[in-house]
């Protein structure tokens, strides 16, 4: 899948079902806390998962790779992070199962529009 990678970004192998993640070379990069958080989630295949304040989407991708839920939605307030996370979904050819939405988790109407999780 052809995906645009910016000069200040890298593609990192998540070592999980071939999944890859686009991240900035400088600034926030995921660490062990995201790996642990996704490990302790109790997700089943039939579940819809929401990842609040998703950032790069790392927890969303790890939960998708580990548990294969029916759908994952990542919510993030920063447009640049949403765009990067959606490019990662495209890179992994999983845009039919995982999507990232720009929004504020304090926006009740937005949360209601996303449905039940």
Predicted feature locations:
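Class I SAM-dependent transferase core
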Residues: 2-44
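Conserved SAM/SAH cofactor-binding pocket of Class I
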Residues: 40-117
């Amino acid at each position: 899948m052809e995906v645009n990678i910016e000069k200040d970004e890298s593609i990192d192998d998540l070592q999980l079902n071939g999944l890859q993640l686009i991240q900035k070379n400088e600034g926030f990069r995921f660490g062990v806390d995201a790996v642990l958080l996704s490990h302790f989630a109790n997700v089943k295949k039939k579940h819809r998962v929401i990842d609040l304040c998703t950032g790069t989407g790392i927890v969303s991708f790890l939960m998708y790779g580990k548990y294969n839920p029916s759908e994952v939605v990542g919510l993030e307030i920063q447009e640049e992070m949403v765009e990067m996370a959606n490019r990662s979904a495209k890179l992994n050819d999983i845009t039919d199962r995982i999507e990232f939405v720009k929004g504020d988790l304090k926006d009740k109407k937005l949360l209601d529009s996303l449905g039940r999780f």
